Amino acid sequence: MTKKYSLGFVGRKAGMSRVFTEDGRSVPVTLIEATPNRIAQIKTVEVDGYSAVQITVGARRAALVNKPAAGHFAKAKVEAGRGLWEFRVEDAQLGDFAVGGEIKADIFEVGQKVDVQGVTKGKGFQGTIKRYNFRMGDATHGNSLSHRAPGSLGQRQTPGRVFPGKKMSGHMGAVQQSTQNLEVVKVDVERGLIAIRGAVPGAAGGDVIVRPASKA
């Protein structure tokens, strides 16, 4: 089965709000800052081995842009952004894009299902209760040491080791995560906003990638 590729959009999570429907229902939404994505490069099968659209968004001070990146942006005649992202597209779609052009929020429609990818909030080093929802030990009844202990890590001399993947204390959060099949509630191109029903990964101010849902 041939995989179908589709164009996405890079925005910034602004925070959460709510909108009211015509019948008075309150719908919780996440607001995404959707400033136009600038096309920095078109990748083709002949040159790069695959078809993709490379975009940038936002702005970055010239002092923070190294020479290779500055040359890349200058060649495309686009302002240096805060990063570069790529979206694989079908070969037949490449004719719809041009280097230096813009992709706006109107590629999405109200009611459309989307997948949103972001970096989750970092929680630092956490124990198994917070990290994996382990059950706590008894608060009293003779328990004086193991209130938040994870319990056994394995067996005995055989196998004599802790199996890989064992749930233990460690760094929590700050990983890429996708939330699938969220509904687009509103698209405001003039104000540069997309309202998506429900929560999306990450903290306010973080970059998120919005794509048409892969399982809709």
UniProtKB/Swiss-Prot annotation:
Q: Which domain of life is it from?
A: Bacteria
The record's section on Pfam families has:
Ribosomal_L3
Q: Which keywords label this protein?
A: Methylation, Ribonucleoprotein, Ribosomal protein, RNA-binding, rRNA-binding
Q: Name one GO molecular function term.
A: rRNA binding
Ranges in a coiled coil:
none
Gene3D superfamilies in the record, alphabetically? 3.30.160.810, Translation factors (2.40.30.10)
Q: How is it modified after translation?
A: Methylated by PrmB.
Q: Cystine bridges: which residues? A: none
* GO biological process terms held by the UniProt record: translation
The UniProt function text for this chain reads:
One of the primary rRNA binding proteins, it binds directly near the 3'-end of the 23S rRNA, where it nucleates assembly of the 50S subunit.
Complexes and interactors: Part of the 50S ribosomal subunit. Forms a cluster with proteins L14 and L19.
Q: Which NCBIfam families match?
A: L3_bact
Q: Which PANTHER family match?
A: 50S RIBOSOMAL PROTEIN L3, LARGE RIBOSOMAL SUBUNIT PROTEIN UL3C
Similarity remark: Belongs to the universal ribosomal protein uL3 family.
Q: What is this protein called?
A: Large ribosomal subunit protein uL3
- Write down the species: Xanthomonas campestris pv. campestris (strain ATCC 33913 / DSM 3586 / NCPPB 528 / LMG 568 / P 25)
